[in-house]
Amino acid sequence: MMEKFEKIEMKIPAKAEYVAIIRLTMAGVANRMGFAYDDMEDMKIAISEACTNIVQHAYKEDVGEITIVFGLYEDRLEIMVADNGVSFNFSTLKSKVGPYDINKPVEHLPENGLGLYLINTLMDDIQIMHDEGMTVLMTKYIQREQVENDGNPISTYRSY
């Protein structure tokens, strides 16, 4: 049996000024689903990075389109960001990027590639497909209230 989910799909011009619309939409969807504030902030950064990569690299001189699909599941939000522009080899790029090295001078930091590292760090799962264009599938799981062994929820609130 296929897992039930709701789908929201959007298409926007691949221009920097439209990335904020996607961030706001994602925040609204995540809030409705019950995500914690910190998780929503992480997802906003990740989706911004994915969209900005498309704006900067996918279409060169042409103005293309970004397709965004939100898959709303009971326990997670899946976000697909796709373009039909110029692709690149993610494995090659991934091998060249990594965490910030505190021993390296700032002027030696790479200008590109940190966005994918950020996405990978902030999301619970990431898959990248590059055939015709690039598709980034990011997943964030909802962190529900933790339950102790006796079945009582753990709370940070005092009861008076």
Curated annotation (Swiss-Prot):
Its EC number is 2.7.11.1. Pfam families: HATPase_c_2. This is Serine-protein kinase RsbW. Belongs to the anti-sigma-factor family. Keywords: ATP-binding, Kinase, Nucleotide-binding, Serine/threonine-protein kinase, Transferase. It catalyses: L-seryl-[protein] + ATP = O-phospho-L-seryl-[protein] + ADP + H(+); L-threonyl-[protein] + ATP = O-phospho-L-threonyl-[protein] + ADP + H(+). The gene is rsbW. It is an enzyme of class 2 (transferase). Negative regulator of sigma-B activity. Phosphorylates and inactivates its specific antagonist protein, RsbV. Upon phosphorylation of RsbV, RsbW is released and binds to sigma-B, thereby blocking its ability to form an RNA polymerase holoenzyme (E-sigma-B). PANTHER family: ANTI-SIGMA-F FACTOR RSBW-RELATED, SERINE-PROTEIN KINASE RSBW.
